[in-house]
Amino acid sequence: MKILFVAAEGAPFSKTGGLGDVIGALPKSLVKAGHEVAVILPYYDMVEAKFGNQIEDVLHFEVSVGWRRQYCGIKKTVLNGVTFYFIDNQYYFFRGHVYGDFDDGERFAFFQLAAIEAMERIDFIPDLLHVHDYHTAMIPFLLKEKYCWIQAYEDIETVLTIHNLEFQGQFSEGMLGDLFGVGLERYADGTLRWNNCLNWMKAGILYANRVSTVSPSYAHEIMTSQFGCNLDQILKMESGKVSGIVNGIDADLYNPQTDALLDYHFNQEDLSGKAKNKAKLQERVGLPVRADVPLVGIVSRLTRQKGFDVVVESLHHILQEDVQIVLLGTGDPAFEGAFSWFAQIYPDKLSANITFDVKLAQEIYAACDLFLMPSRFEPCGLSQMMAMRYGTLPLVHEVGGLRDTVRAFNPIEGSGTGFSFDNLSPYWLNWTFQTALDLYRNHPDIWRNLQKQAMESDFSWDTACKSYLDLYHSLVN
């Protein structure tokens, strides 16, 4: 099968979050499974700076963006068997960052038009075209409404993956003519209109042959008013083509037996290296080096969406326990300030590292006993899977991908891979925290069994790849 991915970011070239991880990992797994895979990404200035000497020029042409003719260069490199093509236009993509400009609508309108017109020119007409989030969600619409006259594109099947429904691409309807060069008919009849705006995500949901999300629970949640971001009715209407597939993690990169960022390696049969990493981490972040105290890790953006309003409200109570917490992350200044204040009040119990450090993050995943992740909503989440890979038990709010990946501790059977609570409130966070602390202190054999189950969980991309192939084969024989 010939599969083409079109996305706004992709590791290792450009990455701001989970979308970049997916584009870096899933195509590689599909190639291993015997498929021909290509990816189209914008050619950002950070790609030029880091990978420019590895990328070759292929061709260039002009793209009509409304009444304008814009330069479009095509560049190319091959990595892990995947051919990466880059859309080059320095005006649109040399901004020092991926997102956040006032003209993001124009930037990604150009990108989508260029990606479609590039397919013939690079001689890669896919059987299946996989687009991601709102930045590329107009492509299924454009294929059916603007480029339907191109015979080579007639049989292309499309899949839209929603990584985060909050970001929908809502713009003025004038963009249809001014940028995409199409009429207003589909806006006037309501197909593309939502809240009196042009909504790119709605267009993708309606025009793609299949819609996927990054976990089965999130696929269900976005059809409810609580999580649907005002598109729940549209998703319910199209529910027959909506499914959820849990993202994977790179099992080779996140491997406690070989991780180059760790001082000591270990496996599920011998956790002595984990204990040494714990002592090393305690020393590094300025906490008393104690093997007996439960060490809780947090690696996250400090935002309300991640549940840190509830954590801050609970923190004074939690820190009355004989416990240590090491936090790494940045975000809302109010939360940054709160954690910094608590770290001053409880210097032997809380280390607040208001920054981001890849090595420290990896040490937290590997060295801690518990990993706190009480997200208000979480489409998939990768941190809980990374933590489990290293025998660090997650304590999570049961939403989205957290519900699908963390098996809550069952005291009757002594089974599970972590701890969870259903109601995001200080009471239930504290109650679940106490359950975990009691198990850690009084039932070490059960705790050790949970660690083993967590480390044996299969979150590899090869497993996720099989689910995506089942989805693709439902469209392409």
From Swiss-Prot:
SUPFAM superfamilies referenced in this protein's UniProt entry, alphabetically: UDP-Glycosyltransferase/glycogen phosphorylase (SSF53756)
Coiled coil, from the record: none
Pathway, per record: Glycan biosynthesis; glycogen biosynthesis
Matching InterPro entries: Glyco_trans_1, GS/SS, Starch_synth_cat_dom
GO molecular-function terms, A-Z: alpha-1,4-glucan glucosyltransferase (ADP-glucose donor) activity; alpha-1,4-glucan glucosyltransferase (UDP-glucose donor) activity
Protein name: Glycogen synthase
Pfam families: Glyco_transf_5, Glycos_transf_1
Function, in words: Synthesizes alpha-1,4-glucan chains using ADP-glucose.
Broad EC category: transferase
Taxonomic lineage: Bacteria, Bacillati, Bacillota, Bacilli, Lactobacillales
Entry binding sites for ADP-alpha-D-glucose: K15
